[in-house]
A protein has these predicted regions:
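Alpha-helical transmembrane segments of multi-pass membrane transporters/translocases
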Residues: 40-41, 214-262
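Transmembrane helix segments
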Residues: 39-47, 150, 159-210
């Protein structure tokens, strides 16, 4: 019970920080919308239809939702580095609680913040021509949370090994931007060069982006905007399984890393 309360307090602290930092929320939403407007409106007429009744803006919109969730959850690891530099993390680590609770609380906080931001972007669906029924939204939310939790655990794991804010700010863009561009946010994964195809398949974000897109656009069969792995067309549940496995591995490693913190 004590450890569960510790998870809640750490999670709640991240919620308070988000509530009192409105500029952070606005900035996190403005960048994805900028991508959507510049690339979507600017290139839709040039790209043509990318699927049955799907133009480039509609294709890109689910990817932008995934990108928002990915960036926000992954970058939330910066709070771990921040807390270390200002001494708060040391106080938490010497508290009479299991250190794994800290990793879980931080990851849940990162995932919840990312979910809030992704849900706000989701509200812009009518402007892109994407029609989302209440049932579709209810299916999207747990998928967004799974992506947020997996990437949040990855970010927290890296943050436990990075000692300064400067180093974190240098490393994170080197990881987030390749993951975004190689996950199919801005282009279909069919017909790309073989070397790039390999990179997309080892990119964990790919499986989250594809799943969100298939649900949002109603192509859950896995044949449209899908991914072939070893000659097998990945189904929606295959993609969920890969992403969930990655998330479990990352949170276990993050918990282990926190237990070794000094």
């Amino acid at each position: 019970m004590k450890n569960l309360r510790a998870v809640y307090i750490i999670w709640y602290r991240d919620m308070l920080r988000l509530w009192h930092d409105k500029i952070r929320l606005v900035g996190a939403i403005a960048l994805p919308l900028l991508f959507l407007v510049v690339f979507g409106i600017g290139l839709t007429s040039k790209m043509g239809a990318l699927g049955p009744g799907v133009n480039f803006t509609q294709f890109m919109f689910p990817g932008i939702i995934g990108m928002t969730v990915l960036m926000s959850s992954f970058m939330s690891g910066v709070s771990v580095v921040w807390d270390r530099e200002f001494g708060f993390l040391k106080e938490v680590l010497v508290a009479p609680i299991n250190r794994t609770s800290v990793a879980v609380g931080k990851t849940l906080g990162a995932a919840t913040v990312a979910m809030i931001q992704g849900t706000i972007v989701l509200l812009f669906a009518p402007l892109t021509g994407v029609s989302l029924s209440p049932g579709t939204v209810l299916m999207l939310l747990p998928l967004m949370f799974l992506l947020a939790f997996s990437m949040g655990a990855f970010g927290v794991l890296l943050a436990t090994r990075i000692k300064t804010m400067e180093a974190f700010q240098a490393v994170m863009p080197m990881l987030t931007f390749p993951m975004i561009f190689l996950s199919g946010v801005f282009f279909p994964l069919e017909g790309i060069p073989s070397w790039m195809s390999i990179l997309t398949k080892i990119n964990p974000a790919t499986y989250g982006i594809i799943t969100i897109r298939q649900i949002a656009l109603g192509t859950t069969s896995g044949t449209t905007f899908g991914l072939n792995l070893f000659g097998h067309t990945m189904s929606l549940w295959n993609n969920v399984g890969v992403l969930a496995t990655f998330g479990v591995v990352m949170i276990l490693l993050a918990m282990q890393s926190f237990s070794r913190q000094e």
